[in-house]
């Protein structure tokens, strides 16, 4: 009986540590963007973007925000992604000092 209690205690401690590891900022979450969309999104539907780099993802990715509020991941080095980024950069006015 004593061995069972000890094993249960060790299991609970291991579970607590694994939860903390997954809760770290570099833990896996939707923003790591490892699941990317290969299909081209029309530029007119895009509102903004942000670049994502993570040690948990093997490639650099971009998250596009559409005019309808959806977020779509895409691989940063695809030609259509680079064109969409250039398009959004041209649309966004640069602030004057």
UniProtKB/Swiss-Prot annotation:
In the record, biological process GO terms are: cellular response to ethanol; cytoskeleton organization; eosinophil chemotaxis; immune response; inflammatory response; positive regulation of natural killer cell chemotaxis; regulation of cell shape; response to gamma radiation
Positions of modified residues (Pyrrolidone carboxylic acid): 24
Q: Which residues form a coiled coil?
A: none
Q: Name one GO cellular component term.
A: extracellular space
The record's annotation in PROSITE patterns points to: SMALL_CYTOKINES_CC (PS00472)
Cysteines engaged in disulfide bonds, as pairs: 33-57, 34-73
Q: Where in the cell is it found?
A: Secreted
Where would I find glycosylation on this chain? 29
Q: Which GO terms describe its molecular function?
A: CCR1 chemokine receptor binding; CCR2 chemokine receptor binding; chemokine activity; heparin binding
Query: Cross-referenced PANTHER family, in alphabetical order?
Result: C-C MOTIF CHEMOKINE 7 (PTHR12015:SF161), SMALL INDUCIBLE CYTOKINE A (PTHR12015)
Complex formation = Monomer. Interacts with TNFAIP6 (via Link domain).
Family per similarity comment: Belongs to the intercrine beta (chemokine CC) family.
Write the protein's name: C-C motif chemokine 7
Question: Its encoding gene is what?
Answer: Ccl7
């Amino acid at each position: 009986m004593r061995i069972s209690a000890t094993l249960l205690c060790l299991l609970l401690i291991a579970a607590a540590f694994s939860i903390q590891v997954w809760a770290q900022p570099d833990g896996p979450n939707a923003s790591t963007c490892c699941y990317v969309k290969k299909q081209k999104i029309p530029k007119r539907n895009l509102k903004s973007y942000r670049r994502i780099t993570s040690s948990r993802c093997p490639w650099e990715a971009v998250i596009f925000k559409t005019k309808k509020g959806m977020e779509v991941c895409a691989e940063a080095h695809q030609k259509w992604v680079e064109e969409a980024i250039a398009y959004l950069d041209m649309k966004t006015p640069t602030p004057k000092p």
